[in-house]
Amino acid sequence: MRKLKNILVTGGAGFIGSNFIHYLFGLSSANGNLFNDANFSGNVVNVDCLTYAGNLESLKDVEEKFGGKRYFFEKVDICNRSEIERILKQYDIDTIIHFAAESHVDRSILGPEAFIKTNVMGTFTLLDAARNFWKKPDGTFRDDVLFHHISTDEVYGSLGETGYFTETTPYDPRSPYSSSKASSDHIAMAYFHTYGLPLTLSNCTNNYGPYQFPEKLLPLMISNIRDGKALPVYGKGDNIRDWIYVEDHNRAVWLI
């Protein structure tokens, strides 16, 4: 297995990203307990532009224990090419784990532009900057580098009452959000096939767990029940969805 030394986590102040950083440092985001599941001893650079869904308070314990030593935060938009290039060079990044994304379906319907900018152009900026930074003089890539792209199962469309998605399921995005993620997936795979960029990609289902923004379905349902408010019904209410606990998702990402 490659020895990971300097990991760039995009969107690390968001829900899944902040939980992943906790996981890397052996801190359970649920109860603060220590565990050493990841067995990671390197450095983490968290790049996040702190939109409404980003919250550095989620990483207060990480900052207190590792800030300035093994954990570093950079408030940077992933579309900012010069800043991304600076970070790659300054921290000698060998691994990028790309969580950063606009991810709320309803918001994508009301304002799709931000989703195209972040999810498509931001991913392109990261891929191209990494390609240039990791490329050796002979055109091949360093053998210690990897770009992992986090995607969603929504790129496959909607399931019926039976069946399941697989790696060979055709893409069938149905919203500006899922379309933007499908686009970023194709760009990522193009960099793998065209340039040979060391790359892995995962398409995960819905996550739930600590630090989740309250607009998401499970915390929204729970808060509405608590406050005696009506529960939202999407479409006819017959859509099938599943969820995975965020720490289980992050274990899978680390295994990949």
Which role fits each region the language model picked out?
Residues 139, 232-235:
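Short, hydrophobic secondary-structure boundary micro-motifs
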Residues 174, 205-215, 235-247:
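Glycine-rich "substrate-gating" loop/helix at the edge of Rossmann-like oxidoreductase active sites
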Residues 163, 214-222:
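A glycine/serine/threonine-rich, flexible loop-to-helix segment
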